[in-house]
UniProtKB/Swiss-Prot annotation:
Gene: rnhB
Binding site for a divalent metal cation: D11, E12, D108
UniProt-recorded name of the protein: Ribonuclease HII
SUPFAM superfamilies: Ribonuclease H-like
EC number(s) given by UniProt: 3.1.26.4
A cellular-component GO term for this protein: ribonuclease H2 complex
Main location as per UniProt: cytoplasm
PROSITE patterns: RNASE_H_2 (PS51975)
Amino acid sequence: MGCVSMTLGIDEAGRGCLAGSLFVAGVACNEKTALEFLKMGLKDSKKLSLKKRFFLEYKIKTHGEVGFFVVKKSANEIDSLGLGACLKLAVQEILENGCSLVDEIKIDGNTAFGLNKRYPHIQTIIKGDETIAQIAMASVLAKAFKDREMLELHALFKEYGWDKNCGYGTKQHIEAIIKLGATPFHRHSFTLKNRILNPKLLEVEQRLI
């Protein structure tokens, strides 16, 4: 990759889901390569179609001048360790693998999870997936992994609408949990916290509002 300045962008997908894994991705490349991806239509993954995300994922993974890392934390790990700890561990793993390759590290959001003491050149950027190409590339990669996981799980549990909601707490998804209960792929710490698994309590609360 030569001596050209390299930037590592980090972003996640699945943070606020009720089901499935958290995926954290890191993508490292120089500005010339980043520009190539912007010309391909790269932007914040939430603004791309599923087909376009999978297309860009393929391009990221097969480009000779791009380094990439994806870390998965399962629903069980999130329940055991907590979401914050899982995010930190995933970011840390990416930094340990990618830090030596790059000159700059840019993380989407407003926290470096305390890792800026060990990696002082980390920058946190709110809505970084809208302004930094490498973060947008990481966003696409993480979201594509999350999309694929939930499509595969949807084949096993069609009633929860995971092909459409991707594990997020939509009305249909919550109603399915109330009616059918949670699957082994649900984050029980999330569903219990939101009182979803106790519909009687939920009805009482609605009457109190």
